[in-house]
Amino acid sequence: MVSFFKTPIIIFFFLLCLNEKVLCSINENENLGENKNENANVNTPENLNKLLNEYDNIEQLKSMIGNDELHKNLTILEKLILESLEKDKLKYPLLKQGTEQLIDISKFNKKNITDADDETYIIPTVQSSFHDIVKYEHLIKEQSIEIYNSDISDKIKKKIFIVRTLKTIKLMLIPLNSYKQNNDLKSALEELNNVFTNKEAQKESSPIGDHGTFFRKLLTHVRTIKENEDIENKGETLILGDNKIDVMNSNDFFFTTNSNVKFMENLDDITNEYGLGLINHLGPHLIALGHFVVLKLALKNYKNYFEAKNIKFFSWQKILEFSMSDRFKVLDMMCNHESVYYSEKKRRKTYLKVDRSSTSMECNILEYLLHYFNKYQLEIIKTTQDTDFDLHGMMEHKYIKDYFFSFMCNDPKECIIYHTNQFKKEANEENTFPEQEEPNRQISAFNLYLNYYYFMKRYSSYGTKKTLYVHLLNLTGLLNHDTRAYVTSLYLPGYYNAVEMSFTDDKEFSTLFESLIQCIEKCHSDQARQISKDSNLLNNITKCDLCKGAFLYANMKFDEVPSMLQKFYVYLTKGLKIQKVSSLIKTLDIYQDYSNFLSHDINWYTFLFLFRLTSFKEIANKNVAEAMYLNIKDEDTFNKTIVTNYWYPSPIKKYYTLYVRKHIPNNLVDELEKLMKSGTLEKMKKSLTFLVHVNSFLQLDFFHQLNEPPLGLPRSYPLSLVLEHKFKEWMDSSPAGFYFSNYQNPYIRKDLHDKVLSQKFEPPKMNQWNKVLKSLIECAYDMYFEQRHVKNLYKYHNIYNINNKLMLMRDSIDLYKNNFDDVLFFADIFNMRKYMTATPVYKKVKDRVYHTLHSITGNSVNFYKYGIIYGFKVNKEILKEVVDELYSIYNFNTDIFTDTSFLQTVYLLFRRIEETYRTQRRDDKISVNNVFFMNVANNYSKLNKEEREIEIHNSMASRYYAKTMFAAFQMLFSTMLSNNVDNLDKAYGLSENIQVATSTSAFLTFAYVYNGSIMDSVTNSLLPPYAKKPITQLKYGKTFVFSNYFMLASKMYDMLNYKNLSLLCEYQAVASANFYSAKKVGQFLGRKFLPITTYFLVMRISWTHAFTTGSHLITYFDPPNTNPSTLPNCASGKNKSPESFFFTHALAAEASKYLFFYFFTNLYLDAYKSFPGGFGPAIKEQTQHVQEQTYERKPSVHSFNRNFFMELANGFMYAFCFFAISQMYAYFENINFYITSNFRFLDRYYGVFNKYFINYAIIKLKEITSDLLIKYEREAYLNMKKYGYLGEVIAARLSPKDKIMNYLHETNDDVMSNLRRYDMENAFKNKMVTYVDDFAFFDDCGKNEQFLNERCDYCPVIEEVEETELFTTTGDKNTNETTEIKKQTSTYIDTEKMNEADSADSDDEKDFDTPDNELMIARFH
């Protein structure tokens, strides 16, 4: 018990621990996608309020404008920027004539370019004000435009970025310096506000004159264009006007304005007039803009935040420190929303449910910034999956930091990442810092000088991974409240580029512009307010101010020079030849746009930001945040095209695809080649490597009868048949719960049922199925190489003269073994007559007619026995590069290609590549080499190993490169094209759906079907139509090939970082492939019963009419009235009986007969429930000692076998029984037969319904009928088995004793073998070891039966004897006397005690000369 004085201490520590947990819980739940809160119990309103109340509003404001650490770091960065501007190689801006009129030279330093040159350039100083830097930025842009060329492009970008950063720093230092001098928070905020209200040169007149008149004329002009029917492209006319602008020079493209400072000042003025000055000067930088919008909120609501304190206030840095979902909760508190975001639902859904019409523009902008900062964070984390380490969005911020430094520095402690081997290995760069064995941990990873140095020195040359590491380093600092990271973020391009993520809607640029026009129309009709004339932070900015200001900012011109909007539109439509901004954005990385054209002028990002805020579809009627979330809602809908929609009817898709391919213009493939990079064709060739030659597989498959069987063994079956049988066996085993348990030992299945009963769980090894097939394939090849003639050629002769075919066999199996984990098998139809021109025409016509009849009356399942099966591997890195480039080409040319036409154009391109491999193929189609694909070099066996591998690849690529490569390409392309894959991957990552992936009947679960049925996605979306032929038409190997389709999909999903979908395909490779094959076989036969089903349907309709009206609809079915008394009233058809439609007992007698047969067929089909191997094999186990005189049964596959017909009979008995009882149920099944089963979408959902409802009723029926008898049979079988084991054990324990006693009493020297002592012991020992014992004990043994539970593991057991009967040993072996003993001795002999008592008796050397039989008897006694 705790003493009294210790109690307060314990309570104190308990409270500390509780507080620690509460503080950590705020970061516990990361919000994926759209910030879904996964753990509502942790972040309850009570817990969150308790935590947030700890933060004082004034302290939070002080952290922004009274923070000494922030002030110090900003000052340090300012000095670093000023120093770098002085030492910059780009000595601009130059001091020219008229420059002094633009800026105050006294606040700048003048520097000569060289000592011998009179030209001077100016650099700002610490005394330069914010307005001075604004003018300085105008000068730099003016002169950069004039001198621009590609050689100095990176230098210009770098200078523009750091000057913009310097301007931001100057603005951030204004309230910090003011508070430091006056120690007054409000006056510091007012000092910041004065920057935008007390402009030095305030213009009295607007650049566009009267605003009302301007917009009135604009709307009249827009209305005129829309009403003019002669104008075809109205959207382009609205943007470009009457002037047709051609592609401009690079400097016109790269900069938003021309080299005119006055025009730049006019842009500043126009944004200032609409209250957008803050956005104009800062740009859409996520950190900087958010910082000042929060300060603007602080000034506007100063009384509520800091005097009354009835609303919570948080600094921008503190908001970013929270988890993704909690950031919105904090924002709701700051914006005084009545409904604070505490829901588990997505932020979009909860935001749109509440009336947000009164929300201020500042809160709308913060909503936008937080939403895309969350997306930026997730994008950075997602991109790490392309590297050697993975992060995930659910990680707490501390763990993200630790995980990052553990990866970069091999230690969670901070280090300078630029000095680590992980960073250096991305490229060979010269390191200007001294080499160190261990990363320097004395200097912080967020050191301002080091990060700025490497940014200026190396950033422009960084690749994707290094740029990612730099931004991820800064992100970890922001998430963990590091002020230095907060300051460093000001110059990182990724925080500007995040605006690009908002252009995800698949709409043309002109359509987005029309939304902006609609916003202006709505504002002009609703109100006519006067503009503010400045960007006073106290002013309320409305949506109308935003729309009008954005329009003017984007459309202002100077001297007939195109506006920003026109430049950007021309760049898209004529430069890049695309119509959608999203097509451009999808090809860019959001954290490294430093290398694209937008980085030449940061105002491009400002233009995109303002244009995005005002171009949402519903912006005219909703505020910015509502319009943004409504736009995202549209993006969430599945992009259902003919390529991506897996429910699209496959016959229509097939014929449409073939039609598009046939009508593709001849020059379209040439155009695609021109759009590709020079080395892409070579990459395409290297994307696949063929390993298992088709002729190699055919030797074990189609030509298996020609192979010599091993001595004493039957001839082997075709390899594809063996593989198909293994899949069928797995399917038969799965319902009994033995799915992939002990896959390496197929004979252990008999014991599994007992393990289940004994609760010894055996976990399934579902991802190991390929190893089973490997053993079967290797066994088939080994048997081939064991043939006598193969041994003579391959093993006993010089390999130099070996047959080409044998060498090809050996190379194929070696390549398969060496690349086992990566090998995939595809197949094609093997129709030999099709490839031989000598085939008579009538035979070809006959085959075609037979195929047509076979397909029309069902489907084409099992039409061919064998297929052409070959193995290959995918070079994932190269293929990913190829697909990324082609996908980018498609996005940039959607005006030329549709998704289907682009796919078929790529297929034709692959056909061209395939033709380049055909140099060694003969021209005549009748050639046997071409028919069986033995088109390798004539001297193939004499080549070295590397050359032979190339021959195999070229041989297979000459026929199957296009089909195989296109299958892999379409998988990746259609996945990237769909906007549903991200959500699908997240759905299968949820705990409730993880079990679907490992389920053996996932195809019958609602989640599997609702989330897209990966089986249908593979067959109807991810793969081309021709890929369905082998998985349907082949009798042997179709399931094996389909499982490899799943494995290819798994690899493709893994390449795109969809880990959950990758695992789903891997785990469902067997179960779903088996289901598909079985479904096709059942569908084929089911459709053959169409005439019979139709006949009974017509008869049923007639009887239904008789039940309802009293007379038959068709008189043929009216029973004769010869003896009406023998027929029930309802059956005679003369009386109405409407209730018989639901249930009738009139045919109960007939139904009972069918129920009887249904019951007995269930006994046969459901025997696996209690007998894992079936009832027959279970009985045979009792006669294993009798050799079975029968032939080996042919392995079963998915076809019409005995079980199939038993199931068919079972189905007939079920139908005849229950259809006769209830006509309503019969009609329900008719609807399924005629409609549901013929539409894949309906059939999949009906399968789920059938499982949970109809099958449930059938299971309950079986439980009270056939299952009872099966259980009784199982119990009886076990009792018989136990009784048999009992007899065996008794006999096994008595047998050695009987033999010894027989030896003792019935010894015949003439017959007895004269065995020596040790031979006899070994003989008895072996006998004891081999009998069946299993350490069983007998219960309720009588006194005379106790010996049954006694065992001796080291010596034989003898009968209980009287001591008087013991034998005595004498020197004469023929004289044996017995002596009576009155007392019994134990039958168990303790050999250890015996050795201790008399070691002489156990000495073999001493007794060596004694006869063996006498020595043995003496040893027993």
Curated annotation (Swiss-Prot):
Major localization class: host cell
Keyword Transmembrane helix recorded: yes
One family name in Pfam for this protein: CLAG
Location in the cell: Host cell membrane; Parasitophorous vacuole membrane; Host cytoplasm; Cytoplasmic vesicle, Secretory vesicle, Rhoptry
Disulfide bonds: 335-363, 409-415, 519-547, 523-544, 1352-1355
One record GO biological process: adhesion of symbiont to microvasculature
TM region(s), chain numbering: 1203-1223
Range of residues in the leader sequence: 1-24
Residue span of region Disordered: 1371-1413
Biased amino acid composition, Acidic residues: 1398-1412
A GO-annotated cellular component: rhoptry
Membrane topology, record value: Single-pass membrane protein; Peripheral membrane protein
Keywords from the UniProt entry: Cytoplasmic vesicle, Disulfide bond, Host cell membrane, Host cytoplasm, Host membrane, Membrane, Signal, Transmembrane, Transmembrane helix, Transport
Complexes and interactors: Component of the RhopH complex. RhopH complex is at least composed of CLAG3.1/CLAG3.2, RhopH2 and RhopH3 with a 1:1:1 subunit stoichiometry. CLAG3.1/CLAG3.2 mediates subunit association through independent contacts with RhopH2 and RhopH3, which do not directly interact with one another. Interacts with RhopH2. Interacts with RhopH3.
Function, in words: Participates in the formation of new permeability pathways in Plasmodium-infected erythrocytes enabling the uptake of nutrients from the blood plasma.
Remarks, miscellaneous: Many Plasmodium falciparum strains have two highly similar paralogous genes, CLAG3.1 and CLAG3.2, that are mutually exclusively expressed. Analysis of blood specimens from 20 Plasmodium falciparum-infected symptomatic patients indicates that parasites predominantly express CLAG3.2 in natural malaria infections. CLAG3.1 is preferentially expressed in cultured parasites. CLAG3.1/CLAG3.2 expression patterns can change under different environment conditions.
Record-given protein name: Cytoadherence-linked asexual protein 3.2
Name of the gene this protein is made from: CLAG3.2
